[in-house]
């Protein structure tokens, strides 16, 4: 009985760590975006990059030692594919991550509610402020370009994530992992972030997008560009992480826990 209770407590701690980690990610990221855009002294896109980078670092600090610090469904699924993460735990992780994104967005929205009203010119809600929470591509981007941008960025993310955790390749301790992820996200934002907002994380986009739909932005956030929310910030990151894992394991990884055994 004690063993069963202990097992359940461990499982709960893991999903709660993922929930809190994603909530922090969105609080820092979306909160910075709100402050940059809604302020009377707007700052630069680099400031938003720093906000999301700080969010990923703090989220990883909270969760890495407990849940592995995935805080991203694409990472969770790819870790199950390539590193033996239990598939039975994947649904719970993804639910907690999406809920964390929802709650994080709700808290930021509550904090900036009046500033959003002033910016929008009343109690109306448009994509101009929806984009502070969820991702929307620049107008010139084609559907294929949007997909590729998210696919590429997430592939890079997972390659580096695997390297940071690779004991055969100078793996970092959990204490240093957040700092490395901070640097990684600064780089991703600076190099690949402009055109789609570099979601690279289905929970960071879907959770806030669901909140927006319930907070007055309506179904437009889901109808945008023929259900952009499915194929760019969800499907592309999931497939991008799979591609990144395949590349890393076929070219660099030397461990025994990969499903790719031909080397």
UniProtKB/Swiss-Prot annotation:
GO terms for cellular component: plasma membrane. It is a multi-pass membrane protein. PROSITE patterns: MIP. InterPro entries: Aquaporin-like (IPR023271), MIP (IPR000425), MIP/Aquaporin (IPR050363), MIP_CS (IPR022357). The chain crosses the membrane at residues 19-39, 46-66, 90-110, 144-164, 170-190, 228-248. Gene3D superfamilies: Glycerol uptake facilitator protein (1.20.1080.10). It comes from the Eukaryota. It is found in: Membrane. SUPFAM superfamilies: Aquaporin-like. PANTHER family: AQUAPORIN OR AQUAGLYCEROPORIN RELATED, AQUAPORIN-9. Aquaporins contain two tandem repeats each containing three membrane-spanning domains and a pore-forming loop with the signature motif Asn-Pro-Ala (NPA). This is Aquaporin Lacbi1:247946. It comes from Laccaria bicolor (strain S238N-H82 / ATCC MYA-4686).
